[in-house]
Amino acid sequence: MFYFNNLVRDVKKELSHYLLDNICKDLPKNITKFVFDMVWGILSSGSSKISNIGRRLFEDNLRVTENRLTLNLMELDLSKVKDNYFHYLSDNLLKLNPNVLIDETDVIKPAGKSFEGLTIIHDASKEGKPREKGFPVTGIVSLTDDNYVVPLITNIYSPLSTGHKSIGDETLKGLNQIVPNIKEGYFGTFSFDRGYDARLYAEYINDKKQFYVIRAKEKRIYTTRKGRMNINQIASHYKGKYSFTYKGKDGATRNAKASAVKVSHKDFKEDFWLVIETIHNENDVRVYLTNIDCSSKEGVIKALKGYRLRWRIEEFFRFIKQEYEFEKFMIRSLKGINNLFICMNVAITFLTSIIQTNKRLWEQIQEVYKPLTNREKEEMLAKKYSYHGINLYRAKNGMQIILGHAKWRPQIPGRNRKKRTE
């Protein structure tokens, strides 16, 4: 038997501490109230749609509520919210030497007409990548000590916007917000997929005294002690100096071998390492660029570990698109959409913080979720998400059930408008 009144009270208390003492600390009352309303609405509705969020605020006129939330999304400056959010992550959840994962995704709006900067992009989720109306999105996430995903940047942009230069420029804007929050004396490892192996990213990370690991394209030509060769030619000379095992995202243990060679490239200022990895029983050779010292086995494994969990950002994209209706927003301005995603990141991180720091409440959320489970559903989740992704899914649905029993949203300390006329 569940005492939902007690559970709702505990969640309200935890959420108030999370937002008022951390995310909205020392911020104006109007911003604090707005962020509180948005995060509460996202958690209790399980959606990023303004209409669903508005219904969970229990106000008299839903249309007025929707207009207020939409107007605030388009007009308020949430940069200080983002700063407080980064400080909270750095102090409470992230590793001291953080693993930062970067990738691009897209938001498809095939029936959209009035969105600011709506452009034509390739829909990567469909076979053949057909051209559709939508927006490109830059995503940057990091991991906790237990490898739970924590969103850092979800930036939607348009090539049609004034001042837009390139995808690389948008990515660097995000990195410029992340790097200063890495504590002095510690070093982040920034993991990029193929397509990011240009000088722009490697030299930026290197200049900031951080580490990078980038999946290399096969067509690149590098200079080694044996001359100029492409990736496949270099890989053919190395059969694997170091042997090791690791667990894939499906949980299976795999045997692999890896070697490392120092190379140079005409576009790069400094030499760097190529790590060549061969997976046993897979006809696949993977090559990574890195500025981590790979002269020893420890360095090679460090570089491979830095990249190994890069697929977690793809899992995060899948989670927000399917569980929070990421592609169904109805906000027209780019600023409003990005402010919506700031609030969504804050809400998702609240779930992660409960899993990581409040074991008693996390156990109660799991107990609430259990009656919903069945074998087929759990097997489906195991195909979609890893162990950590499944836990985040359970936290999201358990939290939605608990807050569904709330009769009103938490009150922000301060002036009560209803008492003004009494």
Where are these regions (language model features)?
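Domain-level cores of phosphate- or acyl-group-handling catalytic modules
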Residues: 161-228
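Active-site-proximal, Lys/Arg-enriched surface segment
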Residues: 39, 66-146, 257-262
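Electropositive, glycine- and tryptophan-enriched low-complexity nucleic-acid-binding patches
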Residues: 124-185, 275-286, 291
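A short, flexible helix-boundary coil/loop motif
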Residues: 1-36, 40-42, 46-66, 71-73, ...
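Extended, non-catalytic structural segments that build the interaction scaffolds
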Residues: 283-310
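Small-residue-rich helix-loop
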Residues: 335-347
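Short amphipathic alpha-helical "interface-anchor" segments enriched in bulky aromatics
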Residues: 106, 302-330
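Helix-centered, glycine/charged polyanion-binding patches within enzymatic domains
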Residues: 154-162, 213-240, 284, 288, ...
